From Swiss-Prot:
Coiled coil: none annotated. It catalyses: Endonucleolytic cleavage to 5'-phosphomonoester. Residues 1-30 are annotated as: Disordered. Residues 518-819 form the Piwi domain. The gene is AGO2. Pfam families: ArgoL1 (PF08699), ArgoL2 (PF16488), ArgoMid (PF16487), ArgoN (PF16486), PAZ (PF02170), Piwi (PF02171). Required for RNA-mediated gene silencing (RNAi) by the RNA-induced silencing complex (RISC). The 'minimal RISC' appears to include AGO2 bound to a short guide RNA such as a microRNA (miRNA) or short interfering RNA (siRNA). These guide RNAs direct RISC to complementary mRNAs that are targets for RISC-mediated gene silencing. The precise mechanism of gene silencing depends on the degree of complementarity between the miRNA or siRNA and its target. Binding of RISC to a perfectly complementary mRNA generally results in silencing due to endonucleolytic cleavage of the mRNA specifically by AGO2. It comes from Bos taurus. The modification 3'-nitrotyrosine is found at Y2. Hydroxylated. 4-hydroxylation appears to enhance protein stability but is not required for miRNA-binding or endonuclease activity. A divalent metal cation binds at D598, D670, H808. This is Protein argonaute-2. The modification Phosphoserine is found at S388, S825, S829, S832, S835.
Length: 860
């Protein structure tokens, strides 16, 4: 079962005993890869020339605290000007907006703490701040040079932080910073997304250590902001009114709820006090209109009366409201009862939208931002010219120079694996540009379908019996060709309506038809029925379900039908295709389990929903079949809390499926940012070891722990136009880079395993945090690339290895398992646990998959 080609691997090094306080250190790069044909590339990294000087680090303490960074920057700017003669002289300090200030020459304050008073001219009255400055340390740029050339074991974090602050100081004052990016409203042309939102374009900038050099990573980026506009217009956009005039009566409850959801948390400024445009944060929307909403008003006589908002504005501001029938915004703190009519408020400019975009907004956003690779390359070059870092006075102060040209990199295009099919002819497919064809091929192991049912939740007048009959015929024909025959007609074919009818219908099916293998469910577009079908099928009754959109039943295409079959065969226990055994890397010579892990978090702005952790494990030698485990955990918790138990379950399942104990565990971990590497590695590596030791005292398989990252800003471009692929002119599938722009000492690489269809391809970044198995660069890169070809839903290589992709699907499916029946779909609805305060145990039970589903790839 586990025979393969090529030389045997070095035996895994026995893991050191797990010591709680021990800091695990990522392994050094073993070598550079050589496999594949070379390709000349350019990366959006710009070489930095750094002097070998010391930088002086000071800590600032600004009172009163809690000012936004923008205000802190103004305070420091005023401070440097005001105390120029006494302290700062001609120095140009840089500041991170919080506490850290850096200078190229020491300030004449020695080691003492200095207290200063700074006045900011404000609207109405000046604001006074107390600022203390204290010396922290000398940051040596010489040490950075030593680390980059390998003379020091690790790159000193504080030097990178200092350089980052230097490079970001001026852009932070010019633009709106968001994370590591800077944005600005487009001059002259707006890019509306609807619902009061618009696209802002900007750029990402970060300082990164690489082999021999520090690099500046620059990329174009875009994000959604709220449009600066009167709140009255915002209401119209959110509630789809052509103009506010069509709303002559108060808002209905559902309109008010929708409006509240959108405006809560946003900042508004008032327009009824002349130049004094005070800003407030919205905490709620009143149930009553301005004509009826009252508040306690203290009169001159000292007595308090209830006054309506409309009356108050008429008496106090001589303003007769035009829309007294509309509600008010409640602003500031809830207990303070400050109400503002909608018509005197504007949405403040420059507020980023952190709430989830609707499907329409997302597709508009993609259309507005997708750029072919050559276009993106040109835009980045333009950006560099306009940023002109070499004339930035702050960058020059520290003696830093940045090259204007992108970095030339030599990459390699790896050979794709051969894909083996089944049937009589055992056909072999060879991917070309990450794609292959299943025509005239049969599944490696097709499942025969004898008992199946159709449930149609689309209206009968739109999806007629003729449609259903023709769809069934087409499905049976393509299934025969694919080597997965459907015997006979469905045993049941009925129409149904609404999510409430799902469970009774499925119970009836399960009890009536012995050996029922599959229920095909037809849906009329986006509907809460989907979540309910998956909840009942996956967690309550343990039935295999396949949902199909009505439009794909009314008009069948070979493409949609074969996509359905790829999914159905796998859900029922079949194997679509496998990697050609003789082409696999040597790691397959002994039993090996591939694990994929991911944690998905609820959308920002939703403080109550849990995060979901999913881990999947391969269950055969191909590897093709996978088994899933899933848990709910604390909101926004990044580390997988119950990993030891999850891995233990998967190891037991692997043994049941194969009768082998894996001698190696290859763990692909998605969704971890660089700042969390150490923490995640420490906790999760120990958890995997604990899972092994709990199974058997001396069981110590070699563990390789690899973090997969897609959310980064590295982009690669072909230098030679003839190498560009497809309409978007991207790099070829299989392009790998492990030199020049990678980590100075650690084992990491970029691999673009998919063919980019729209926009510029984003290569995945792989960082090896632990490796008992002593992989060479070639072997790990080839293994990773081959695993990107084993994703069952399509006949193309995907952008990350199948196990990591499946973990993502499992976590995503668990979100649907948590959806309350009375609400709508997983995107927009409350998840159980918020609306009715379900405790952790109930949530944990809700995502637990039924015993019969557990061993299947229900998530495919």
């Amino acid at each position: 079962m586990y025979s393969g080609a090529g030389p045997a691997l070095a035996p895994p090094a026995p893991p050191p005993p797990p010591i709680q306080g021990y800091a695990f250190k990522p392994p050094p790069r073993p070598d550079f890869g050589t496999s594949g044909r070379t390709i000349k590339l350019q990366a959006n990294f710009f070489e930095m020339d750094i002097p070998k000087i010391d930088i002086y680090h000071y800590e600032l303490d600004i009172k009163p605290e809690k000012c936004p960074r923008r205000v802190n920057r103004e305070i420091v700017e005023h401070m440097v000007q005001h105390f120029k003669t006494q302290i700062f002289g001609d120095r140009k300090p840089v500041f991170d907006g919080r506490k850290n200030l850096y200078t190229a020459m020491p300030l004449p304050i020695g080691r003492d703490k200095v207290e200063l008073e700074v006045t900011l001219p404000g609207e109405g009255k000046d604001r006074i701040f107390k600022v203390s400055i204290k010396w922290v340390s000398c940051v040596s740029l010489q040490a950075l040079h030593d680390a980059l050339s390998g003379r020091l074991p690790s790159v000193p974090f504080e030097t990178i932080q200092a350089l980052d602050v230097v490079m970001r100081h001026l852009p932070s004052m010019r633009y709106t910073p968001v994370g590591r990016s800077f944005f600005t409203a487009s001059e002259g042309c707006s890019n509306p997304l609807g619902g009061g939102r618009e696209v802002w374009f900007g750029f990402h900038q970060s300082v990164r250590p690489s082999l021999w050099k520090m690099m500046l990573n620059i990329d174009v980026s875009a994000t959604a902001f709220y449009k600066a506009q009167p709140v009255i217009e915002f209401v119209c956009e959110v509630l789809d009114f052509k103009s506010i005039e069509e709303q002559q009566k108060p808002l209905t409850d559902s309109q008010r709820v929708k409006f509240t959801k959108e405006i809560k948390g946003l900042k508004v400024e008032i327009t009824h006090c002349g130049q004094m445009k005070r800003k407030y944060r919205v905490c709620n929307v009143t149930r009553r209109p301005a004509s009826h909403q009252t508040f306690p008003l203290q009169q001159e006589s000292g007595q308090t009366v209830e006054c309506t908002v409309a009356q108050y504005f008429k008496d106090r501001h001589k303003l007769v409201l035009r829309y007294p029938h509309l509600p008010c915004l409640q602003v500031g703190q809830e207990q303070k009862h400050t109400y503002l009519p909608l018509e005197v408020c504007n949405i403040v400019a420059g507020q980023r939208c952190i709430k989830k975009l609707t499907d329409n907004q997302t597709s508009t956003m993609i259309r507005a931002t997708a750029r072919s690779a050559p276009d993106r390359q040109e835009e980045i070059s333009k950006l560099m010219r306009s940023a002109s870092f070499n004339t930035d006075p702050y960058v020059r102060e520290f003696g830093i120079m940045v090259k204007d040209e992108m970095t030339d990199v030599t990459g390699r295009v790896l050979q794709p694996p051969s894909i083996l099919y089944g049937g009589r002819n055992k056909a072999i497919a060879t991917p070309v540009q990450g794609v292959w064809d299943m025509r005239n091929k049969q599944f490696h192991t097709g499942i025969e379908i004898k008992v199946w049912a159709i449930a149609c939740f689309a209206p009968q007048r739109q999806c007629t019996e003729v449609h259903l009959k023709s769809f069934t015929e087409q499905l049976r024909k393509i299934s025969r060709d694919a080597g997965m025959p459907i015997q006979g007609q469905p045993c049941f074919c009925k129409y149904a309506q609404g999510a409430d009818s799902v469970e009774p219908m499925f119970r009836h099916l399960k009890n009536t038809y012995a050996g029922l293998q599959l229920v095909v469910v037809i849906l009329p577009g986006k509907t809460p029925v989907y979540a309910e079908v998956k909840r009942v099928g996956d967690t309550v009754l343990g039935m295999a379900t396949q949902c199909v959109q009505m439009k794909n039943v009314q008009r069948t295409t070979p493409q949609t039908l074969s996509n359905l079959w790829l999914k159905i065969n796998v859900k029922l226990g079949g194997v679509n295709n496998i990697l050609l055994p003789q082409g696999r890397p040597p790691v397959f010579q002994q039993p090996v389990i591939f694990l994929g892990a991911d944690v998905t978090h609820p959308p920002a702005g939703d403080g109550k929903k849990p995060s979901i952790a999913a881990v999947v494990g391969s269950m055969d030698a191909h590897p093709n079949r996978y088994c899933a485990t899933v848990r709910v955990q604390q909101h926004r918790q990044e580390i997988i809390q119950d990993l030891a138990a999850m891995v233990r379950e998967l190891l037991i399942q692997f043994y049941k499926s194969t009768r082998f104990k894996p001698t190696r565990i290859i763990f692909y971990r998605d969704g971890v940012s660089e700042g969390q590497f150490q923490q995640v590695l420490h906790h999760e590596l120990l958890a995997i070891r604990e899972a092994c030791i709990k199974l058997e005292k001396d069981y110590q398989p070699g563990i390789t722990f690899i973090v997969v990252q897609k959310r980064h800003h590295t982009r690669l471009f072909c230098t030679d136009k003839n190498e560009r692929v497809g309409k978007s002119g991207n790099i070829p599938a299989g392009t790998t880079v492990d030199t020049k722009i990678t980590h100075p000492t650690e084992f990491d690489f970029y691999l673009c395993s998919h063919a980019g269809i729209q926009g510029t391809s984003r290569p995945s970044h792989y960082h090896v945090l632990w490796d008992d198995n002593r992989f060479s660069s070639d072997e790990l890169q080839i293994l990773t690339y081959q695993l990107c070809h084993t994703y069952v839903r399509c006949t193309r290589s995907v952008s990350i290895p199948a196990p990591a992709y499946y973990a993502h699907l499992v976590a995503f499916r668990a979100r649907y398992h948590l959806v309350d029946k009375e609400h709508d779909s997983a995107e927009g609805s409350h998840t159980s646990g918020q609306s009715n305060g379900r405790d952790h145990q109930a949530l944990a039970k809700a995502v637990q998959v039924h015993q019969d589903t557990l061993r299947t790839m229900y998530f495919a």
